[in-house]
Each structure stands twice: as structure tokens, then as C-alpha cells.
């Protein structure tokens, strides 16, 4: 038996976040549901696909306003997406849920009434246990930046599963996050404020992407706890648990060449938009390839589509060191890298026509983007 009445708008927001952990393709039918657990002073929502689990605690009051009135404690598992769709379409400002001993659930709001067949919550798998010791703490803003600056570079191919995740290495109180799909590499470094144990884990890119969606742009802190095969992110009323990927992440430090041939500074926005325009033809050509040549403090970008025509763009460069160079690259990779650099001025280092090149913010080594060129010249 369970009964409570809750503010509908608040409930919808929390249900939407819980739903992000639920996959229709699960092998366990009960995991397509949301577990609802009404306790004396709070309601807990749980969603899981066995890879990612999200647990959200709804307190009785938020900022002095009553959110939920709990008449009787109890639990039930309700069909996730169907239940959320019902709550979204209900007419009233409040929703009342009550269950009987067979987990039949009555949902009422305004003049609407739904009866849903619930499942026994005791059949719902237990969430992984993650020790609350030895946390690292970041601000939500910083974590969202880390995800934006690395996660796009993970591999989407399952042939090397470790590359579908981001490597988080904690060493000497520095956090180094690395992602690569073998064609490009993104690295973000951060000095940690508190003493932290050394760690080397791989967090699935999909999990970080879902976590990013449910974190609001706030100055809140997020606590991150690691277990042998799980990671827990705790922020506000949300616990987000993800399975870690097994295996050894490749040593990517050897990919960075030494002694650049050419180094130049360039305006991030000008460079990005020029590549964006040139990529219109590159995409039509079917290969996303843009040719770049340097000389006379100019960067020239060009692309050709046999059916449509050609495009040429010029962007001013500054602080140019070295001679001239021609190189070709994937326009999408370059635009992703520039988007990840949160700085108006970008430094680009070239090491040769067929060697990887590096982009980073001017006078800042905390973000590094590496891209492998394409052989066209």
C-alpha cells in the first residue's frame, strides 16, 4: 500500500531525469519501469538500464513550499515511459498516487483517473553499492566543461570498447581526462584542490552524456565517488551511478609529436566560421575533407565538390613561427575541436603534412585537441 499527493510540474521534471536511465532494449522487463518508493519524509524515484542508474530524492518541501504530502508509505514499479506520458497530460496541478496490495495503482488529477498495473518493487534489482569514502569534488560548471571538451571525441564503434569511454586519470592531485576515437584526441587537465587518491578509470561516454543532460548550469558542487567497477556522481537530490568500462586505456602521450614545424595564432570564431562555410562543399563531396595551406600570415582553406564547384576562404593568422605547409583534415573534427576550446584565440601547431596537429587555447595547456590529417597532397 502506498499513497501520496505531489505537485505535478515538479514531479514531471524529476520523472524526466529518472527516465534518462531507462532503455526500452533492456533484457530485464522490470527495468523498463520507474521504481517509486514513498518513505515518511521523501519520495525516491529510481531508473536503471543496469549500465546507468539514476536515483532522485523528492523531499516533502523545497524552498519552504510543500511539494509532496505522503499519506502512506510503500513502493511500486510503474511502466516508465507510459507513466511519465500520463503524468504530463493530466489536467490538475497536483497528482495523487495510491496502490493496493496487488500493486494496482490509481492515478488521479482533476477529473482524470487512470488505473495502472504495477510490479512488485522487491523484484527490482538492487542498485550497485558505491562507498561514500574518498570523493573528489568539482563544481557542476567545471564538470560540464570537462564533458563538453572531451566527450565528443569518444569512439562510437564497439570494436574497441575502451575507446567508447573517457579515461579519467588522477595522478599527483591532477585530473587528466582523455577521449579518442583513433582519428582525434581530446585532453582536459585540471588541478584538484583537495588531496585525492590516484585513480585510473574509464567512464562510458554515453553515461557522461546523460549526466550532462540532468545537471543544471549551476555553481553547485558535485561529489564523485569511485568503486572498483562503478562511479557515483552525487549532486543536489540526484545520485547518478554508472558502470565503469573494463580494460586498459591506451597510452596516448606518445601520440603527441615534439618540435613543431609551424605554429600560429588564429581567432577561434573566424577560423570556425570559415571552416563551417568551406565544409558545405566538403560535405557534398561526401568526405568532409578541407585542404589548408599557410603562408604570408594567412591560412587558406579550400574544398571541392566535383558536381557543385569549389570554395576558398582566407583567415588572418598572427604570431606565425615557421614556414609554409599544406595539410588536409576532416572538417567536422576540426569544428568539434574549436568548439571545445573556450577561448577567443587558438594556437595551432603543425608537425608535418602527415603528422597529427594540435590545437589549444592561447597561453593555456589545460585543453589540448589533436587531429590526424588526411592524405590528399
UniProtKB/Swiss-Prot annotation:
Belongs to the beta sliding clamp family. SMART domains: POL3Bc. It holds the Pfam family DNA_pol3_beta. Keywords: Cytoplasm, DNA replication, DNA-binding, DNA-directed DNA polymerase, Nucleotidyltransferase, Transferase. GO terms for cellular component: cytoplasm; DNA polymerase III complex. Its main location: cytoplasm. The gene is dnaN. The lineage of its organism: Bacteria, Bacillati, Bacillota, Bacilli, Bacillales. It comes from Staphylococcus epidermidis (strain ATCC 35984 / DSM 28319 / BCRC 17069 / CCUG 31568 / BM 3577 / RP62A). SUPFAM superfamilies: DNA clamp. Confers DNA tethering and processivity to DNA polymerases and other proteins. Acts as a clamp, forming a ring around DNA (a reaction catalyzed by the clamp-loading complex) which diffuses in an ATP-independent manner freely and bidirectionally along dsDNA. Initially characterized for its ability to contact the catalytic subunit of DNA polymerase III (Pol III), a complex, multichain enzyme responsible for most of the replicative synthesis in bacteria; Pol III exhibits 3'-5' exonuclease proofreading activity. InterPro entries: DNA_clamp_sf, DNA_polIII_beta, DNA_polIII_beta_C, DNA_polIII_beta_cen, DNA_polIII_beta_N. It comes from the Bacteria. Forms a ring-shaped head-to-tail homodimer around DNA which binds and tethers DNA polymerases and other proteins to the DNA. The DNA replisome complex has a single clamp-loading complex (3 tau and 1 each of delta, delta', psi and chi subunits) which binds 3 Pol III cores (1 core on the leading strand and 2 on the lagging strand) each with a beta sliding clamp dimer. Additional proteins in the replisome are other copies of gamma, psi and chi, Ssb, DNA helicase and RNA primase. GO terms for biological process: DNA strand elongation involved in DNA replication. It is found in: Cytoplasm. The keyword Nucleotidyltransferase applies. This is Beta sliding clamp. GO terms for molecular function: 3'-5' exonuclease activity; DNA binding; DNA-directed DNA polymerase activity.
Amino acid at each position: 500500500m502506498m499513497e501520496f499527493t505531489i505537485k505535478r510540474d515538479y514531479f514531471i521534471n524529476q520523472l524526466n531525469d529518472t527516465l534518462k536511465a531507462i532503455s526500452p532494449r533492456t533484457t530485464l522487463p522490470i527495468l523498463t519501469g520507474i521504481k517509486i518508493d514513498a518513505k515518511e519524509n521523501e519520495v525516491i524515484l529510481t531508473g536503471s538500464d543496469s549500465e546507468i542508474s539514476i536515483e532522485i530524492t523528492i523531499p516533502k518541501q523545497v524552498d519552504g513550499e510543500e511539494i509532496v504530502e505522503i499519506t502512506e508509505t510503500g513502493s511500486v514499479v510503474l511502466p516508465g515511459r507510459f507513466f511519465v506520458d500520463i503524468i504530463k497530460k493530466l489536467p490538475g496541478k497536483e497528482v495523487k498516487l495510491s496502490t493496493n496490495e496487488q500493486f494496482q495503482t490509481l492515478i488521479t488529477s482533476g477529473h482524470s483517473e487512470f488505473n495502472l498495473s504495477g510490479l512488485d518493487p522487491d523484484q527490482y534489482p538492487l542498485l550497485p553499492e558505491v562507498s561514500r569514502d574518498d570523493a573528489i569534488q568539482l563544481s557542476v560548471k567545471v564538470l560540464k566543461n570537462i564533458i563538453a571538451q572531451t566527450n565528443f571525441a569518444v569512439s562510437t564503434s564497439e570494436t574497441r570498447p575502451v575507446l567508447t569511454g573517457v579515461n579519467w586519470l588522477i595522478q599527483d592531485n591532477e585530473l587528466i581526462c582523455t577521449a579518442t576515437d583513433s582519428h582525434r584526441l581530446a585532453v582536459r587537465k585540471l588541478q584538484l584542490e583537495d588531496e585525492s587518491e590516484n585513480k585510473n578509470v574509464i567512464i562510458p561516454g554515453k553515461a557522461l552524456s546523460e549526466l550532462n543532460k540532468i545537471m543544471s548550469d549551476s555553481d553547485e558542487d558535485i561529489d564523485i565517488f569511485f568503486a572498483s567497477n562503478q562511479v557515483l556522481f552525487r549532486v543536489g537530490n540526484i545520485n547518478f551511478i554508472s558502470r565503469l568500462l573494463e580494460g586498459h586505456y591506451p597510452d596516448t602521450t606518445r601520440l603527441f609529436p615534439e618540435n613543431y614545424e609551424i605554429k600560429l595564432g588564429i581567432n577561434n570564431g573566424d577560423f570556425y566560421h570559415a571552416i563551417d562555410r568551406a565544409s558545405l562543399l566538403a560535405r557534398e563531396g561526401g568526405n568532409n575533407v578541407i585542404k589548408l595551406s599557410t603562408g604570408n600570415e594567412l591560412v587558406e582553406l579550400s574544398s571541392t565538390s566535383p558536381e557543385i564547384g569549389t570554395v576558398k576562404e582566407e583567415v588572418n593568422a598572427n604570431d606565425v613561427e615557421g614556414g609554409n605547409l599544406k595539410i588536409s583534415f576532416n572538417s567536422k573534427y576540426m569544428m568539434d575541436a574549436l568548439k571545445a576550446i573556450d577561448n577567443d584565440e587558438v594556437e595551432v601547431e603543425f608537425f608535418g603534412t602527415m603528422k597529427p596537429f594540435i590545437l589549444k587555447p592561447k597561453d593555456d595547456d589545460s585543453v589540448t585537441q589533436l587531429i590526424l590529417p588526411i592524405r590528399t597532397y
